[in-house]
Amino acid sequence: MPRTQRNDNFIDKSFTVMADIILKMLPANKKAKEAFVYYRDGMSAQADGEYAEALDNYYEALKLEEDANDRSYILYNIGIIHASNGEHAKALDYYEQAVDLNPQMPSALNNIAVIYHYQGEKAKSEGNTNEAEALFDKAAEYWKQAIRLAPNNYIEAQNWLKITGRSEMDVFF
């Protein structure tokens, strides 16, 4: 049974009904509508913690979706799932693909920075100072890009950049 037919909470049902109405009104072709259904089902499964099901839906959506901007959000969500499963290399790959298609996606840039920062902290704790600094520098570059796009967001990253001397800007916002 499709996920849209088994939503049992009010918010999911409301979202599904609204999405179906919008989908019917949009002048999209059949392929685009089908891609959206897979994407919507992927988001619903992801919200329920059903990551394997979400990935299946996202991969199907990717096969059908032609719009670069829409593809970027599918790739971004796949990255989120891989990151939450601790698969950082896969997550980075999907986030990078999302940014390649949509350079105006600060959330993907932030998530890339978070992974590099995490890897830097891990390298630092293992005594690999040079590797840690290189990873921290990568994190800084991605955070700067994210902050330029969304200056009122990522306050902790802004503070980290200032504290570590990796910010050439006095004020981001």
Swiss-Prot record:
Domain of life assignment? Bacteria
Q: Where in the cell is it found?
A: Cellular thylakoid membrane
Where are the annotated TPR repeats, by residue? Answer: 35-68, 72-105, 120-153
What does the UniProt keyword field contain?
Membrane, Photosynthesis, Repeat, Thylakoid, TPR repeat
**SMART domains referenced in this protein's UniProt entry, alphabetically:** TPR (SM00028)
InterPro entries (alphabetical): PSI_Ycf3_assembly, TPR-like_helical_dom_sf, TPR_rpt, Ycf3/AcsC/BcsC/TPR_MFPF
- What biological function has been recorded for the protein in this entry? Essential for the assembly of the photosystem I (PSI) complex. May act as a chaperone-like factor to guide the assembly of the PSI subunits.
User: Can you say what this protein is called?
Assistant: Photosystem I assembly protein Ycf3
Q: Please name the taxonomic classification of the source.
A: Bacteria, Bacillati, Cyanobacteriota, Cyanophyceae, Oscillatoriophycideae
The gene designation is ycf3
